[in-house]
Amino acid sequence: GFLDAKDKRMKSTIDAIEKKLCKKGLVMRYTIEDDFGKPVNSFSVCTFWFIDALYRSGRKKKAKQYFNSVLQYSNHLGLFSEDIDLATGELVGNFPQAYTHLSLLTTAILLSGQGSRRPVCLPHLKHAVKPK
């Protein structure tokens, strides 16, 4: 990111997100009423981004708690939708949601301790950045 995750400004941003947008272990996109009314759903991809931020800021235990919590909302196949209804836990919106699953995977890799490794690039991929 443009700021180190342990920077005090990032930590205060993470705290504000947790205080104002986290409900039942999930993160809402926003809480302001719009053309559709007052939001009642969390936004799944934001939840995984929030967990990443927690982990990178050094709050690894809390990040893992949030991660384990959000996994409880997947369906019987482990799939997620774009949104989760905060009142019922129902998966709503686009289903299955590709961006959510991409974020789920990157968060799982990060929390496993493998996320800090630099990717190994194959020499035939000229556009790839080679590790130092």
Model feature map: region roles:
Residues G1-F43, Q65-S116, V120-K132:
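Extended glycan-interaction surfaces of carbohydrate-active proteins
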